[in-house]
């Protein structure tokens, strides 16, 4: 009984600390706040919300893209481990998935920056050449922002984050699929269903709430990811959805990590704490909505 109370107290303490520290910037003297933001951003933003808006957009964009990339691959791997692979292979793959989940994010950042960035450039060049009519893949091959920072774009970061959250979604989904009642599976097979039809009729409906929970866990990891984004993405403060252009977007967590060490205690630190409060609220809302969706799916 004491542990849940401790968790609630800790959560409330973090929220109140962020709110107390950020409130003068959010709800205080707006003229003074404007001067603070203009000084901190070099006149690129004139109020707190104008500054944090592109960061929220970049955070949501990168996280959503990574979830889209990872979701179907994770579910496929989880189904293969739970229902298709021989026992020894399934055990080995489970160990690999669990190991991937334990790798520190800075290692993923090094891999992304040193290996993936140059390796994936030809792929993005192909997208830019043949799919630029879609607007989101509009990235001129002669664009200086691409030439100076090859592949240090939202698209590349989304791929790296997808690899990071893939083992989380896979692991949780695998465990849920393996809990499917044997009687339901045998009943579907007994009615003449193929293995894939049995999965569609029994396994996926049984595991839909678990799939939602796994996806939200992965999304939460992506929302708060710092080092991998910081080490790969060429940052910018815009509302751009051009995934192949550098210096367009930035995430809240990576921006805090980049700015905080050199931030002025009277100017920069309150701004960083304010953006941290926004990230806290976003993460809380995502988990709250996920909880409601899971409850609805379980009903």
Name every feature range the model reports, one short phrase each.
Residues 80, 138-141, 146-190, 194-197, ...:
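Membrane-cytosol interface at the C-terminal ends of specific transmembrane alpha-helices
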Residues 20-66, 86, 147, 258-269:
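Periplasmic/extracellular loop-to-transmembrane helix junction in inner-membrane transport proteins
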Residues 66-97, 110, 291-295:
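Transmembrane-helix boundary motif in ABC transporter permease subunits
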Residues 1-3:
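Short, small-residue-biased leader/transition segments that mark boundaries at the very start
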Residues 174-178, 182, 258-299:
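C-terminal transmembrane helix and the adjacent membrane-cytosol boundary/short C-terminal tail
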Residues 96-99, 103, 107, 169-176, ...:
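Transmembrane alpha-helices
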Residues 28-50, 108-163, 243-246:
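Membrane-interfacial helix termini and adjacent extracytoplasmic/periplasmic loops
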Residues 221-265:
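Glycine-rich helix-loop "coupling/hinge" segments at transmembrane-helix boundaries
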